[in-house]
Amino acid sequence: MQMSSKVWSAIKEEVALRIAAEPSLEKFLTNLVLKQSSISSATAAIIASKIRSDALASDEINNFIKDAYTRCANIEEKLEADLEFFKIMDPACQYYSTPLLFYKGFLAVSTYRAAHCLWNHDRHTMALFLQNRASEVFGVDIHPAAHIAEGVMIDHGTGVVIGETSVIEANVSIFQGVTLGGRGFNSGKPVSYTHLRAHETQRN
């Protein structure tokens, strides 16, 4: 899917400058960003390069995530909103390409977005596989059934757990060591439920 946006154009310009500054990373940055057609395709390629395993190679995971993204309503806008929110809220984030390439919180939420779409299309096993790999690699555990709006920032993120009963609205910041959602069951029903409103911040 070909997409054109101000953010995507800025990302490509930033990555070209990164290559000029660090030529040894040219192949890495070219393959994962400059050869891609949109924020979603670049995000899928970067995630796949991180969470590949003996079970599924990078190309296979890339295809699964891209396929999931095609089923997600407004996925480009959601990923773009996440990047925008990072740039606004994190003083250390001066470029859109920084969370895309290097922030595990952004990549964990982006993996969740693919898993959530798969979950909603009854592909629970693949959704849980993506959840598990993201938890192992990024240290952020987000259940595919959770509901997360656009414009969410998980900063640092180590030890963040977002359960299946969680609802997170737009423009919410979450830091490390935070658990949200059900922690137990009573007669088959969750006994805890978390709803983070817009503009909330959750810290350990």
Which residue stretches match the model-derived regions?
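Terminal amphipathic alpha-helical/low-complexity segments used for targeting or macromolecular assembly
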Residues: M1-R133
